[in-house]
């Protein structure tokens, strides 16, 4: 998400790591999954264990192709119903030249893998250990299905699997939300990526780029902040508003940089958020305190799926299905009021106004978790970056990025893939 937000809709140089690392990473997962899928039947162990492990591998493969398609393929609404260029679909251990499949064929493979994974998980009657949130299980397959279907604009399928995915994961409490709810698995987390003191990425981790309490220099000197435009739309009664340092009356900051080096805003930050700031951190207006590292410099488990996203997937899908305004209103009330995030929340909106409400609360609830760029791409909506005086970006980044800009936000295939896979020669952008 960091790479996508910074360069994904503006530039993508074929031989730079920003472009090729996601390709390498997800195809590495796919290759490992293929090895398991091809060989698990001949491994030792019970049939139930084999079914469970194969289901996990299929889920990893489906998840990886879903992520790759969002980066390296056109958004579904621009794909001519999936007939546009997709990805090389490697589903075995062969390494020869391989042309791309269509985007529809990519999603067909994702669905097929998840259907088989769900069947195998169910037949195995096994589940992961309670502490192994990083290990895929049946609910992870459901969640992957829900997100993939949403991205494909398969609304009924997205809603169906979102309900199944969240069934065993109640929304986190307010105390969990504001204190470590995004670096350590809790009751709401469906699936996460493991990271701990004995196995971590040090200064390359997500939390070493975004954690407000991280000792990493990028976090101490350039704090991640919410846009003023979004902050102002969060109700005062909403606990999520307290996750950001919004200036109050009489609190000032340097509008050319966003920094507050002294004064009332600085003093309040150092007092009210002392346990969420590294001792030498710079203070910025609208800086975030939602994403915290569990240990230095950037240790923390990275959430991949949680129940809140599933509520929002079902709500968005309902808006497109039509005739489900009442159900969608109830979903938003459950997420915002019943959870305790905003006890004063109500929703009576209908039609397109209701869809816009869902989109707004998707931005609020999932802020900082890696969704904005992907959402704006699939929504086919412009990203509007405002300058520091308006509470957001440095002036040179304060631009508007249209959905049609830069190859419709579609990343180019990495040079290494094109150089060694001659079957892709006709697909060079």
Show the residue positions of the predicted features.
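Single conserved hydrophobic/aromatic residue that forms the stacking wall/gate
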Residues: 1-8, 13
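Acidic/polar-rich alpha-helix caps and helix-coil junctions
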Residues: 17-207, 232-429
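Von Willebrand factor type A / integrin I
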Residues: 185-186, 213-218, 224, 228
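Acidic-aromatic pocket-rim loops
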Residues: 201-220
């Amino acid at each position: 998400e960091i790479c996508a937000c910074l360069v994904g809709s503006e530039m993508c140089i074929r031989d730079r790591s920003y472009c090729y690392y996601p390709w390498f990473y997800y195809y590495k997962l796919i290759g490992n999954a293929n090895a398991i899928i091809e060989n698990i039947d001949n491994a030792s162990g019970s049939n139930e264990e084999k079914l469970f492990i194969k289901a996990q591998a299929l889920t990893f493969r489906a998840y990886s192709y879903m992520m790759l398609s969002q980066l390296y393929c056109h958004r579904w609404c621009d794909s001519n119903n999936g007939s546009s260029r997709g990805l090389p679909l490697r589903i075995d251990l062969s390494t020869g030249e391989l042309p791309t499949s269509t985007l529809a064929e990519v999603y067909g493979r994702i669905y097929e893998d998840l259907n088989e994974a769900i069947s195998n998980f169910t037949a195995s009657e096994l589940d992961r250990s309670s502490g192994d949130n990083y290990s895929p299980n049946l609910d992870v397959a459901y969640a992957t299905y829900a997100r993939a279907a949403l991205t494909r604009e398969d609304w009924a399928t997205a809603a169906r699997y979102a309900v199944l995915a969240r069934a065993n994961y109640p929304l986190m409490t307010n105390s969990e939300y504001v204190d470590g709810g995004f670096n350590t698995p809790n009751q709401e987390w469906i699936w996460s990526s493991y990271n701990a003191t004995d196995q971590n990425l040090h200064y390359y981790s997500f939390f070493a780029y975004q954690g407000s309490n991280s000792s990493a220099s990028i976090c101490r000197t350039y704090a991640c902040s919410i846009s003023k435009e979004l902050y102002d739309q969060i109700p005062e009664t909403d606990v999520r508003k307290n996750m950001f340092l919004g200036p109050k009356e009489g609190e000032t900051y340097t509008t050319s940089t966003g920094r507050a080096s002294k004064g009332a805003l600085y003093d309040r930050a150092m007092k009210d958020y002392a346990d969420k700031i590294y001792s030498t951190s710079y203070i910025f207006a609208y800086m975030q305190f939602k994403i915290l590292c569990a240990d230095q410099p950037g240790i923390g488990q990275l959430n991949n799926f949680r129940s809140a996203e599933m509520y929002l997937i079902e709500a968005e899908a309902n808006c497109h299905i039509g005739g489900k305004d009442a159900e969608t209103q109830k979903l938003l009330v459950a997420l915002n009021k019943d959870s305790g995030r905003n006890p004063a929340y109500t929703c009576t909106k209908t039609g397109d106004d209701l869809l816009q409400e869902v989109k707004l609360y998707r931005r609020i609830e999932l802020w900082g978790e890696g969704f904005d760029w992907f959402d704006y791409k699939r929504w086919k909506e412009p990203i509007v970056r405002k300058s520091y005086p308006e509470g957001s970006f440095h002036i040179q980044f304060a631009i508007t990025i249209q959905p049609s800009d830069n190859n419709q936000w579609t990343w180019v295939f990495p040079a290494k893939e094109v150089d060694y896979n001659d079957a892709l020669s006709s697909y060079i952008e």
